[in-house]
């Protein structure tokens, strides 16, 4: 019991400190791109003392790692914007799990408008029997547990995208286990649609897209993929950088929810808020394995960075201390990661060397030296006697290997 309360005190301290840090390091945004049209002010890289040689090295790295598009915003203005491998500024691309962070904002907006309360049971909105849990177990699952990845629904040896009740059965009490389980997240769409009485795309279009000039939509299949062009992704990042405000208008005005969203949400994974990844924490977990890594999620990145991360390197990095947004879309950069954390760390190595005073000696074909530090099965046990194994490396990379016998 004492350990539990000490965890709660730690979270309260981290939340208070992070709120103060985020608010004091965020700049007063003086520039926002127009809601309509293609006009968007730029800032010369030379104003940031970035050298063209180092920029070229970064772009080569991006191209060699299957990047489709890349944007860096500073003070809301475009410093770098590159389209590669057949992509263009009008091409729509999927966000993958980076859309989880978008959904967190939408849930917050629905709560702000009184449609739902994240302390409510999920069953309040989508009815009973949405899982194979007992009635009491199901009632104990709240919307906030879906946001925190702590529903306790089984994530071992199942289709993580299956939202049928037969796929969703009890493993642990909510808040006792952090697990990156896609199905409870996918059901947030049903929660929002039931609560608001609107389709998810209609609600997003009214409350977000038309307010900040975004263009994007969720697909109709059960994977819930969100599609947009790259600048729309950057606009969303700019909105969150400015704490839910856009050019004087409050898009998400609930500051309590906003700060809960971008800070540690539970004691199990310090580096996870409400569907947002948080840098600079003492430890972190990654998808699909019950293992806690020491240190921050991205050691090369600023400690105040928050990120929306998706499969195959879909990335939105938000850095309040630098008033900067970094967006990457593309195909798999070959990091063998369920999310983009390892690739994101590599990316930051190049970003950190953009200044003319830096010497960029990286080869675009080089790989970080790494060693295996642990081999576990899907349950998190140290073993090599399993058909499915997860190899954990010193740089945070995780490889899933299927052993054929």
Question: Where would I find each of the regions flagged by the language model?
Answer:
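Active-site helix/loop module of the DD-peptidase/beta-lactamase fold
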Residues: 113-151, 198-229
């Amino acid at each position: 019991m004492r350990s539990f309360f000490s965890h709660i005190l730690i979270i309260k301290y981290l939340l208070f400190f992070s709120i103060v840090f985020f608010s004091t390091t965020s700049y007063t945004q003086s520039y926002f791109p127009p809601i309509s049209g293609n006009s968007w002010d730029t800032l010369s890289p030379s104003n940031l003392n970035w050298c063209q040689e180092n920029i070229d090295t970064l772009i080569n790295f991006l191209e060699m790692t299957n990047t489709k598009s890349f944007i860096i915003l500073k003070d809301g203005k475009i410093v770098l914007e590159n389209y590669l491998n057949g992509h263009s500024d009008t091409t729509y691309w999927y966000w993958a799990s980076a859309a989880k962070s978008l959904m967190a904002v939408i849930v917050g907006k629905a709560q702000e408008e009184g449609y739902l309360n994240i302390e409510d049971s999920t069953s309040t909105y989508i009815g009973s029997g949405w899982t194979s849990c007992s009635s009491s177990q199901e009632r104990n699952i709240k919307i906030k547990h879906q946001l925190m990845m702590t529903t306790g629904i089984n994530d071992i040896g199942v289709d993580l995208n299956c939202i049928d009740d037969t796929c969703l059965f009890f493993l642990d009490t909510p808040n006792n286990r952090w697990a990156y389980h896609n199905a409870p997240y996918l059901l947030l769409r049903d929660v929002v649609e039931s609560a608001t009485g609107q389709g998810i795309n209609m609600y997003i279009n009214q409350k977000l897209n038309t307010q900040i000039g975004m263009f994007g939509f969720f697909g109709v299949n059960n994977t819930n993929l969100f599609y947009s062009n790259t600048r729309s992704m950057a606009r969303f990042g700019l909105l969150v950088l400015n704490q839910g405000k856009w050019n004087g208008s409050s898009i998400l005005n609930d500051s309590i929810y906003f700060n809960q969203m971008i800070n540690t949400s539970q004691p199990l994974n310090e580096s996870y808020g409400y569907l947002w990844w948080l840098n600079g924490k003492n430890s972190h977990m990654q998808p699909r394995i019950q293992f806690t890594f020491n240190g921050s999620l991205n050691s090369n990145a600023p400690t105040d960075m928050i990120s929306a991360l998706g499969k195959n390197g879909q990335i939105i990095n938000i850095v309040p201390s630098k008033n900067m947004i970094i967006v990457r879309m593309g195909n798999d950069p070959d990091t063998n990661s369920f999310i983009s954390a390892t690739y994101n760390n590599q990316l930051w190595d190049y970003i950190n060397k953009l200044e003319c005073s830096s010497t960029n000696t990286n080869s675009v074909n080089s790989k970080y030296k790494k060693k295996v530090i642990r081999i576990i099965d899907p349950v998190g046990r140290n073993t090599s006697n399993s058909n499915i194994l997860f190899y954990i490396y010193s740089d945070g990379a995780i490889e899933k290997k299927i052993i054929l016998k």
